[in-house]
Amino acid sequence: MADKLLDLHQRRDEAIHAGSPRSVERQHEKGKLLARERIDVLLDPGSFQELDMLARHRAQSSGLEERPYTDGVITGWGTIDGRKVFVFSQDFTVFGGALGEVFAEKIHKMMDLALKVGAPVIGLNDGAGARIQEGVVS
């Protein structure tokens, strides 16, 4: 059991640091906040609950050999002034924040949950379009 928990913690750490150190540095050099940093600024401290942190793309196409966690978008919910909101934040450090199949599924799931509870959705966009390697589903 301890091995499985250690594996889960390692995967979670990989997801939190999904972008390469160089891509993180480039974002900061441009004066941009990272996806998680934007969420932290927006929401009440400690309120963010992430959905599907360990999601990865399923594409078999060339050019998509890497399979970082999050698939380029952070999704979840938190509060602003104590009121529940759902949020997604594109992660430019992972695939340039480009839309893919799993990326879209994560946003769709988050929007469905927001609709069920009557909470607003906030999108923090910083992406490079769509991953056409994944075909029409992206």
Model segments located where?
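Terminal-region recognition feature
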Residues: M1-S138
